[in-house]
């Protein structure tokens, strides 16, 4: 059997430094920002999104989406973020940060479905 060694504080801090160095191109960064903006001004992007969202994601969601997509790229051995990285973490990052409308909830629409529509609506880099 393989012995698992505990994670040290030093190795955790080193990993954090490496993740922060992961490159995100301007085009990919713009895609990330547009996803967040689409939650705040949803009617401009899609009538359905406009009906489903009362409140969109906060500035902290932008930061979390950025950090999580960089971390995923790092864990996959890349030194750059792709739109696929952003899409891969979007549900986990945004699910609890969106306030759905009464219409959405009454219609059986959940946050995952709203995020699916968001990813389908906002063009990627």
Indicate where each model-derived feature is located.
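Phosphate-sensing "switch" segment of ASCE/P-loop ATPases
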Residues: 1-44
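C-terminal engagement/docking regions of AAA+ P-loop ATPases
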Residues: 17, 41-125
């Amino acid at each position: 059997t393989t012995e698992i060694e505990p994670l040290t504080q030093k190795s955790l801090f080193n990993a954090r430094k490496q993740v922060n160095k992961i490159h995100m191109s301007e085009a990919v960064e713009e895609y990330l920002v547009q996803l967040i903006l689409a939650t705040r001004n949803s009617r401009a992007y899609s009538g359905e999104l406009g009906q489903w969202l009362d409140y969109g994601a906060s500035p902290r969601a932008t930061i979390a989406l950025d950090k999580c997509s960089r971390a995923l790229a790092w864990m996959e051995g890349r030194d750059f973020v792709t739109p696929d990285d952003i899409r891969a973490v979007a549900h986990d990052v945004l699910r609890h940060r969106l306030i759905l409308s009464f219409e959405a909830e009454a219609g059986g629409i959940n946050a995952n479905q709203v995020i699916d529509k968001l990813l389908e609506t906002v063009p990627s880099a």
